[in-house]
Structure formats: structure tokens, C-alpha cells
Design a protein with these regions (language model features):
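Extreme N-terminal leader/targeting segments of oxidoreductases
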Residues: 1-25, 43-51, 69, 545, ...
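Beta1-alpha1 glycine-rich phosphate/pyrophosphate-binding loop at the start
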Residues: 1-3, 37, 41, 45-84, ...
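N-terminal glycine-rich phosphate/pyrophosphate-binding loop and immediately adjacent elements
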Residues: 13, 19-148
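Amphipathic alpha-helical segments that form well-ordered structural scaffolds
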Residues: 88-95, 181, 227-238, 434-442, ...
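Rossmann-like flavin
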Residues: 99-206, 217-219
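Short, glycine/acidic-rich hinge or "gate" loops at secondary-structure transitions
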Residues: 103-111, 245, 527-537
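Helical element adjacent to the flavin cofactor pocket in flavoenzyme catalytic cores
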Residues: 202-284, 289-290, 302-303, 308-317
Length: 590
């Protein structure tokens, strides 16, 4: 497996891998990483579909990429913010047929939609019960805070192992709009991994200027289950891939001899019946280890979601622990799943039932939410919320079967253990109705109307996810297994807890990248895997981000010590009349 960039590799079709007709594949899980692996086995690996078996413990595919209507109402556990430089994602989705537009791909639909209706937030944050917080596109960070960010950007990864963000930043960063934007957009907490924070900065340096108003982002038409998962599953079924639902993989055994590692068997359980499936070197095994939505609990309008981080037999954490016990190269799951109080947050899906609540939404987002176009344009953060509440409406309808007079709102709170500002209870102890009341309070609904609207004008379903931020926990090298560990001959790890270079977790791209790299490595496919977009090596992006992070202030306006000011003045003299001076002026750096 090797990385590439450019159209030469991107548009090429690889030759059929040697011996692939004699191979089969077992894929544990049906999340985005697993489905991506299956799609690449079919498209580029040219494996027969009936040789591919997707094993899923739940009754539906998709993993964390969900969006369903239950008896209790619509539920979206999360949402996906996407980037034009998700290179693997677009490499695959260009080949997945649309379910709605004949002759078009999922990428075509997505591209046309975001061209016609580009994303932009008109109100990034509120305070004082629905008043615009007037962040006004500003990062509001001091020169000292900017230097802390720059220092992290250039700190070697080796020095950031097991470090927290609080080990690097202080209140110069934490009190800024920058941190409010960052932590709520990506769900970072102050105690999370400084290494991952650095990777994010480098990965999305080209989008720094688009963070305050979300012009950097793109979204799907519907929820991600309907817009991404269903087309992928349909593509796979059309190629004969087998899906086994409500089937747990409770154990994987490995034969490890010298430097060679082979997955030798998997134990599956279906309807209480357990079976051991032996594996040969020609049986490829793809393992989704860990899981950000494991142990999640769903509430209802009149029921709290609760908080139960118990790791149950057959879930992703339990399986990874059994696997990790067999070899040090298989990672250290305890680094991620041992402190659920530090890795949880709670979300809720609020469905409006009449025209009473939408007027308050419209006042804040400054758009009509019923047009089918962009509404909030990303999350609206309630700056003075004790839960640090954020909420969003993507294009409506979010579900194909959603009534046209209803809206589906996604709400989440980073601090599920704190009492609310109106409902004096921790979010995790609140029913859907109570979470809706807290949200309505922060929308600016008159207090005398809040209970009535939460009761009769909305249906709210909360979801508690104890491990949703587990991948952000401080880590060291080796805590996540390599996608294909050294010496592995027939297995690979997939998803957010598998290790690949430079990319960032909690993204669709990371999951899909692990799936592509796993297949390309095990089948030795002779085509390049698209490298992570290289904006971190592009001096144009670096200078542009530096200026925009400082709200347009020039380098010459920095609060520098006397000696550094003199040095800068001398440098500017040296470059006078050169292309370098012209370049810096073009990007408003001087």
C-alpha cells in the first residue's frame, strides 16, 4: 500500500489482485469503515460479492451513522460535517449510485447540492436567552494565545504523547471565541488529547478562515443513514454481499508464531447459538475495534436516557479487550474506555409538531426553516449554557418520510453532569421533555409558555453516549493498533481506534480511510491511496490561516518583544521588492 495524489492515480482502475478469487472476507461491524472496506473489496479488489460477509450485532447497518424513526420518534445520535478534501470519501462515493437520481453518483448529488445551496451560518452563538452573541466572525484571540496555538502546531508528536490540551493551552486560548468555536464544532474537552488537537490544526489549516461562519463545511441532503449508508448497502447487496444482522462476534483468536500473525477463528453468536468459524490465510478478517456509540441508551419524551457505561459482552470494547490481550501490537483499549465520565456527552432529536416553535428558530437563524435550503448552517452554540448546549437544523426534511410541517432539530450538550439553567437537573437525568424545555428557555421562549410547548408542540428523544469522545482521550503511540499490524497476514483493524498517519478521528473520512487502507494492504492493490490533503505543507494556507486566526491583523501588528520587532523590521527590508514581499502582501500578512 502506498499514498498518492493527483489525477493520474485518482482516475486509474487497478488490475485484479492475484489470487483474489480464492479469498473471502469477514467484516466485523457495519459502520462506515466496515462498509467502505466492503465497497473497496468489490470495486478495486474485484472480489466476488458472495465471498464477502458483513457481521453486525444490531438489526440495522450504519454504526454511529444513524437516522431512524422509532415508535418514540425520530432519532439522530449525531451529525456529520464534511470537507471538500475528504479524499478517500469522494474517491469511493463517486462510484456509489444515487438512490434518487438515475445515472448520478452519491458524490454527484452531494456536489450539486452544495454548489446550489452553499453552507453559511448567520448566527454562530447566542447568549442571554436567544440574543445574538455577536461573535461576528472573530476569533478574539490574543497574540499570546495565537503563539500557544503556533507552538502546538510545531511541537513534535513524540512530545505530545499522553498530554492533555490543558498541558499546552491556558486561558489565553480557553477564553477566546476560537476555543468556543473549536470545542463545540469538534466536541473537544479541555482534558482531551493535545496530540489530536495538533493533528486537527494541521489537517484543517486550510479551513481556519471558514470556522467562524461554517463556510468551510458541507452537508448531505438527508441524515447520513439515508444519504450515505443506504446507498452503500444497496451497492453491496446489488453485488451479492451477505449481511448477517443481530449476530455478535464474541471472540477472535490469533495464531502468532515468530513474526507472523494470523487470525485463526472467530466466535459468532446469533439468537443465543454460538458457533466457531475457522479462518485460513485466504480468509481476510476486518475488525471494527472499540466503538464510540457502544453502551448508548435512548430515552423518550417522558423518559431520561440515563447513563450506563457498562461494557457488555459482544460489544466493540469487550471484543477489543479480548483481542488486545493476545499481542501488544493490538493496542490498549483501556486508554479509551476506562473513564466514561470524561468521554461522554448527550444529544437529543427534537421534532417540532406545529408552527409555534419554528418562529423562535427563524428569529435566531435568520432563515425560513421550511424552504428545504440551509437553515442554521451548522450548530448554534449557547455560550452561557451550563450544559454548553449547541443545536442545529440541517436542510429539512431530514428524513424522507418526515411530515412537511415538522422540523427535526439536533441538540447536544458537552456537560451532561451539570444542572441546567432552567431545568435544575443534569442533562443525563432529564427526560426528552425537560431537555426541550431547557432548549426553549435558551431560544428565548417566554417562561410561561415553555412547559406547554415542550409538552404539545415537540417530541424529544434523548440519547446518552458514554464513549462518544473516547477517541479524544490522551494517548501514546501504540495505544491504537496499526490498521494492518506488523506481521499480520489476513486481518486488519478498522475505524476510529485504528492508527493511520496524519488524519483526524471523529470524521467520516477517517473511518473510510481505514477501510481503504486495510483492503489495499491485504490484497496488495496496485493503485495509490489518496494521501491526506497536504495543506499543512502549503505556505499559502499557513500564512492565510495565521492572518485570519488573528482576525486580519498583520504580522507587523504583533505584540513582539523589542529584539523580535527589530529582527522583523530587518527581514522586511531584505525582502523589499521581491516576490516574497508581493506574496505576503497578497495574503495581507504585511
Amino acid at each position: 500500500m502506498y499514498y498518492s495524489s493527483g489525477n493520474y492515480e485518482a482516475f486509474a482502475h487497478p488490475i485484479k489482485p492475484e489470487g483474489v478469487d480464492n479469498k473471502s472476507a469477514y467484516i466485523i461491524g457495519s459502520g462506515l469503515a466496515a462498509l467502505t472496506a466492503a465497497c473497496y473489496l468489490v470495486r478495486d479488489g474485484q472480489m466476488q460479492g458472495d465471498h464477502i460477509h458483513v457481521i453486525e450485532k444490531d438489526p440495522l447497518p450504519g454504526g454511529a451513522c444513524d437516522g431512524y424513526k422509532y415508535d418514540i420518534g425520530y432519532v439522530m445520535r449525531g451529525g456529520r460535517e464534511m470537507d471538500n478534501h475528504f479524499e478517500v470519501m469522494w474517491d469511493l462515493l463517486r462510484s456509489i449510485p444515487s438512490l434518487e437520481t438515475e445515472g448520478a453518483s452519491v458524490l454527484d448529488e452531494y456536489y450539486w447540492l452544495n454548489k446550489e445551496d452553499p453552507n453559511k451560518s448567520l448566527c454562530r452563538a447566542t447568549e442571554k436567552r436567544g440574543q445574538d452573541a455577536h461573535t461576528d466572525g472573530k476569533f478574539g484571540i490574543s497574540d499570546r494565545g495565537a503563539m500557544e496555538i503556533m507552538k502546538l502546531f510545531f511541537t513534535p508528536d513524540e512530545q505530545l504523547q499522553d498530554k492533555k490540551i490543558t498541558d499546552i493551552f491556558d486561558d489565553e486560548v480557553f477564553r477566546s471565541n476560537f476555543w468556543m468555536y473549536w470545542r463545540t464544532m469538534f466536541a473537544f474537552e479541555n482534558w482531551h488529547s493535545a496530540l489530536e488537537m495538533k493533528l486537527y490544526l494541521k489537517r484543517y489549516i486550510h479551513h481556519i478562515g471558514g470556522l467562524p461562519d461554517f463556510t468551510a463545511l458541507r452537508f448531505t441532503r438527508y441524515n447520513q443513514y439515508e444519504s450515505i449508508i443506504l446507498p452503500m448497502v444497496t451497492y453491496l447487496k446489488d453485488h451479492g454481499v451477505e449481511f448477517r444482522y443481530e449476530t455478535k462476534v464474541t471472540d477472535v483468536r490469533f495464531r502468532i508464531e515468530g513474526g507472523k500473525k494470523q487470525a485463526s477463528s472467530i466466535t459468532v453468536e446469533h439468537k443465543g447459538e454460538e458457533k466457531v468459524l475457522p479462518l485460513t490465510e485466504n480468509d481476510l478478517l476486518f475488525i471494527t475495534n472499540g466503538g464510540c456509540v457502544e453502551s448508548c441508551t435512548i430515552g423518550a419524551q417522558d423518559k431520561a436516557a440515563g447513563f450506563d457505561p457498562t461494557i457488555k459482552p459482544g460489544n466493540g470494547w469487550d471484543l477489543w479487550k479480548k483481542i488486545a490481550a493476545q499481542d501488544p501490537s493490538f493496542g490498549h483499549p483501556e486508554k479509551f474506555c476506562s473513564q466514561p465520565e470524561l468521554s461522554n456527552w448527550e444529544s437529543a432529536t427534537i421534532t417540532t409538531l406545529d408552527d409555534k416553535i419554528p418562529q423562535y428558530i427563524k428569529k435566531i437563524c435568520k432563515r425560513d426553516p421550511f424552504t428545504g435550503h440551509t437553515v442554521t448552517g451548522g450548530i448554534v452554540t449557547v455560550k452561557d449554557s451550563s450544559w454548553l448546549l449547541s443545536w442545529t437544523l440541517n436542510r429539512q426534511l431530514q428524513f424522507r418520510d418526515q411530515p412537511k410541517n415538522q422540523l427535526c432539530v439536533w441538540v447536544y450538550g458537552l456537560f451532561s453532569d451539570k444542572p441546567g439553567d432552567y431545568v435544575k437537573k443534569p442533562m443525563r437525568d432529564c427526560t426528552g421533555r425537560e431537555i426541550c424545555m431547557e432548549w426553549l428557555y435558551h431560544l428565548g421562549v417566554p417562561t410561561e409558555d415553555i412547559a406547554e410547548l415542550a409538552d404539545h408542540s415537540a417530541n424529544t428523544v434523548p440519547v446518552m453516549m458514554p464513549y462518544i469522545d473516547a477517541f479524544f482521550m490522551p494517548r501514546a503511540f501504540g495505544d491504537r493498533p496499526d490498521i494492518v499490524p506488523k506481521g499480520a497476514v489476513n486481518f486488519a483493524f478498522l475505524g476510529q481506534f485504528a492508527e493511520t498517519g496524519r488524519d483526524t478521528i471523529f470524521t467520516t473520512e477517517y473511518s473510510m480511510r481505514t477501510g481503504m487502507e486495510a483492503v489495499y494492504t491485504l490484497l496488495d492493490i496496485d493503485r495509490g491511496v489518496p494521501e491526506v490533503w497536504g495543506s499543512t505543507y502549503d505556505v499559502r494556507c499557513l500564512i492565510d490561516a495565521t492572518v485570519k486566526l488573528r482576525d486580519g491583523k498583520k504580522l507587523t501588528d504583533m505584540d513582539l518583544p523589542f529584539i523580535q520587532r527589530v529582527a522583523l523590521k530587518e527581514v522586511l527590508k531584505k525582502i523589499e521588492g521581491t516576490d516574497l514581499e508581493k506574496f505576503l502582501k497578497e495574503y495581507n500578512a504585511i
